[in-house]
């Protein structure tokens, strides 16, 4: 769990993914379309993959990936991110991390 907490607070927006996950890719594209360059951790390339998955689930993710953190706080998985986006609540949350040059 410590590793996940450390990794999730490295940058403003952090997404834990797996390289074969299409929903992970969709969430990454959403953030890029919103002018945010998230830090991506592909956990299937990490030797601690299983432990990271377990930690993400313990933190409250409905699925281990994608797991989105903003400002070091868990936002959630695909359902939570898309719900925030559709309700208009995602952009204010990520505003400090948007790039004007992106």
Swiss-Prot record:
Keyword list, A-Z: Cytoplasm, Disulfide bond, Electron transport, Redox-active center, Transport
A GO term from the CC aspect: nucleus
Main location: cytoplasm
PROSITE patterns for this protein: GLUTAREDOXIN_2 (PS51354)
Any Pfam family the entry gives: Glutaredoxin
Residues in Glutaredoxin domain copies: 1-101
UniProt-annotated location(s): Cytoplasm
Listed GO biological process terms: cellular response to nitrogen starvation
Top-level taxon of the source organism: Eukaryota
Annotated disulfide bonds: 21-24
Role played: Has a glutathione-disulfide oxidoreductase activity in the presence of NADPH and glutathione reductase. Reduces low molecular weight disulfides and proteins.
Family statement: Belongs to the glutaredoxin family. CC-type subfamily.
NCBIfam families: GlrX-like_plant (TIGR02189)
Name of the protein this chain belongs to: Glutaredoxin-C13
